[in-house]
Every structure is written in C-alpha cells, then in structure tokens.
UniProtKB/Swiss-Prot annotation:
<feature type="transmembrane region" description="Helical">
    <location>
        <begin position="19"/>
        <end position="39"/>
    </location>
</feature>
<keyword id="KW-0288">FMN</keyword>
<feature type="transmembrane region" description="Helical">
    <location>
        <begin position="67"/>
        <end position="87"/>
    </location>
</feature>
<feature type="transmembrane region" description="Helical">
    <location>
        <begin position="41"/>
        <end position="61"/>
    </location>
</feature>
<feature type="transmembrane region" description="Helical">
    <location>
        <begin position="213"/>
        <end position="233"/>
    </location>
</feature>
<comment type="subunit">
    <text>The complex is composed of six subunits: RnfA, RnfB, RnfC, RnfD, RnfE and RnfG.</text>
</comment>
<protein>
    <recommendedName>
        <fullName>Ion-translocating oxidoreductase complex subunit D</fullName>
        <ecNumber>7.-.-.-</ecNumber>
    </recommendedName>
</protein>
<dbReference type="InterPro" id="IPR011303">
    <property type="entry name" value="RnfD_bac"/>
</dbReference>
<keyword id="KW-0285">Flavoprotein</keyword>
<keyword id="KW-1003">Cell membrane</keyword>
<dbReference type="GO" id="GO:0005886">
    <property type="term" value="C:plasma membrane"/>
</dbReference>
<dbReference type="GO" id="GO:0022900">
    <property type="term" value="P:electron transport chain"/>
</dbReference>
<keyword id="KW-0813">Transport</keyword>
<dbReference type="GO" id="GO:0055085">
    <property type="term" value="P:transmembrane transport"/>
</dbReference>
<keyword id="KW-0249">Electron transport</keyword>
<keyword id="KW-1278">Translocase</keyword>
<feature type="transmembrane region" description="Helical">
    <location>
        <begin position="299"/>
        <end position="316"/>
    </location>
</feature>
Length: 350
C-alpha cells in the first residue's frame, strides 16, 4: 500500500533551530582567533547583543500578538546577535551595540514581517547603520595583542565598553597605540589611509600591522571562519555556490587590479584573508532569506558581492566593504531570481 500525501515530498530533516545552532557553532574557530588576538571585548559584545536581540524579539512578538517562546527558541535572533557581535569592534560603546542590535531585530527583521520575510540581512543593516552614524567608533579596532602597548584583560574590556576608560584610566585612544607608539588600525584601514596620502601599496605594507597574508591576527581570524565555513558545507547547511562565487570573483578582481596597478593595490591573498572576507562569504552572504535561491542566481549573487567588495575597497571611502556589498546584492535578489529561474520541464521558449 502507498500512502497518499500532499507536497512537499522531499524534506530536510534539519529544523530551523538546528540550522541556526550549526551556524553559531561554526563561528567558534573564528571567534576564538578573534578573542586571542583582540581580547575579551568580542565575547562581551556577543553576550550584550544576545540579551538585546532576544529582548527586542520578545517585545515585538508580544506587540504583534505572536507566540514568543517558539520564536525565541528558533535561534534566528540569537544568530543575528552573534554575527553583530563578531562584526563590531571589540570595545565599541555598549549603547551603540544595543542600538544597532535593536534596529536589526525591530526594523530590519520584523518591519518586513519577521522570520523568512526580511529583504535585507539584519546583521548587515545594523552594521551599516552604526558605520554611517558613528564612523570613528566603528573603525576603532585594538592592535593585535602581540604588538599592543597595553595588556587588556576582561575587566578592562568591560570597563571600556561601559564607561569609555580602562580600570587604570586609559582611554580608547590610548589603548589603540602599538608598542611603537603609533596608533593602530586594521590592515585594510591602514592601507586605505596610506594610499590617500600618496604612498604606494608596497610602502604602506611595511607598517607593523602587516604580517602574513592579511595582517597580524587577521589571517588567523579569516582562517578560522574558513574552517567554520567548510564545516557548514560538509553539513549541507549552506550551498557552495555563494561563497565559491564570492571568493572566486574577489580573487579574480584583485588579481587583475594588482597586475594593472601594483602600486595602488594590495595582493590578491591580502584581500582574501583580511577584514571580513571569510565571515562575509560563508556566514553573512549565505543567509537563506535575503540571498538568491536559484542555482544560477546564487552564482550571479556571489559574483556581484565579490566584485563589489573589491571595487568599494579599492575606490570607495570605507576600508572594508562586505556590509555594503551584501546589502546592494540583497536589493538585486528579486531581479536575479526572476532572470535565473529554472525552466519548467516541457515548457516552450518564448
């Protein structure tokens, strides 16, 4: 006897909660590398973002008359909080993180209808809101621990986040200094600043912060997220097309740029292993709600992000570009899906 049932006939055994937990678990290698090189601030930011995201989610659901507990347990708000905490500078003032996280949940997610309805990636909406509103604080990263002038423990990190000063009274401006007395910035920011001052890329990359493929600490952070991304691919949580297209197009664009203008462009490997490249390619751009859903569309979507990342890094006003690239690509998803929709078997071409 055959059972008669309605579609769908193929099912994914992984529920939403399981998928979200797997993605959070895959963030662990990158998070550990980030914490090793940049201190306890990232952990504090993630915890604060979790409290804010879950509280905002519960508040909006209560106002909308929707069940609160199932939505809090599905893991979507928690994942958004984790991605926000990982994306922001470790010692960003607490109220900025709360503002960005609440905006991500209330506006970027629930204004469009809630889970599965948002047009834009909520974590990246929060990031861009804060970057445009508070550019100085959003580009204030600590130097890697190996070249930092001050040792920042958990208490110091918490004190700076909530009061603006360490336990010893040092300000954020002082804590940003390296052992050579120079104020540190991310490798991408240092490169952008040096090029605007008329230096060549080779001259800029003699700076202390440049070491390895993507700069001190950043190479390991990106390797950590690459490892987590490969885990997601192995678990079939994400599709290979989006990260593959992003990394491939970014590598190709960076290679062409480096061959044509080597004095004004960093090496292709630098673009792959600096900034938010691996976090963006495997964890942010692959958001199943705001990303393209067709096989060819995912390739187009990924290529668009990769090219935009390089163009904005090279010619734009912001050192890293993943948030802008992802949001611009999100905007194009309806058109991409419409143009790349698979042909129905047996249908005639018009």
């Amino acid at each position: 006897m055959f059972n008669i049932a309605s579609a769908p006939f193929a099912h994914n055994r992984k529920q939403t909660q399981t998928l979200m937990l797997l993605v959070i678990l895959a963030c662990l290698p990158g998070f550990l590398a980030q914490s090793w090189f940049f201190g306890w601030g990232t952990l504090i930011q993630i915890l604060l973002a979790l409290v804010t995201a879950l509280g905002s989610e519960a508040l909006v659901l209560r106002l909308r008359g929707r069940p609160v507990k199932p939505a809090l347990l599905d893991g979507s708000a928690a994942l958004t909080a984790v991605l926000i905490g990982l994306s922001l500078p470790p010692l960003l003032p607490w109220w900025m993180l709360v503002l960005g996280t609440a905006f991500a949940i209330i506006i970027a997610k629930h204004l469009y209808g809630g889970l599965g309805q948002n047009l834009f990636n909520p974590a990246m909406v929060a990031y861009v809101l804060l970057l445009v509103s508070f550019p100085v604080q959003m580009t204030s990263w600590l130097p890697p621990s190996s070249i930092a002038a001050y040792d920042i423990g958990f208490g110091d990190a918490a004190s700076v986040i909530f009061t603006g000063f360490s336990l010893d009274g040092y300000s954020m401006a002082q804590l940003k200094q390296g052992v050579d007395g120079l104020t540190m910035a991310t490798p991408l920011d240092t490169l952008k600043t040096g090029l605007t001052q008329g230096l060549t890329a080779g001259e800029v990359m003699t700076h202390t912060v440049f070491e390895g493929w993507g700069g001190i600490g950043w190479s390991w952070v990106n390797l950590g997220y690459l490892l987590g991304g490969l885990f997601l691919l192995q678990q079939k949580v994400i599709n290979w097309r989006i990260p593959g297209a992003i990394l491939g197009s970014l590598l190709l664009a960076a290679t062409l740029g480096y061959l044509m203008t080597p004095d004004a462009t960093a090496t292709p490997m630098f673009h792959l292993f600096s900034g938010a490249t691996m976090l963006g390619a495997f964890f942010i751009a692959t958001d199943p709600v705001s990303a393209s859903t067709t096989p060819r569309g995912r390739l187009v979507y990924g290529v668009l992000i990769g090219v935009l990342v390089y163009v904005i890094r090279r010619f734009g006003g912001y050192p890293d570009a993943f948030a802008f690239a992802v949001l611009l690509a999100n905007l194009c998803v309806p058109l991409i899906d419409s143009l790349t929709r698979p042909k129905v078997y047996g249908a005639r071409r018009k």
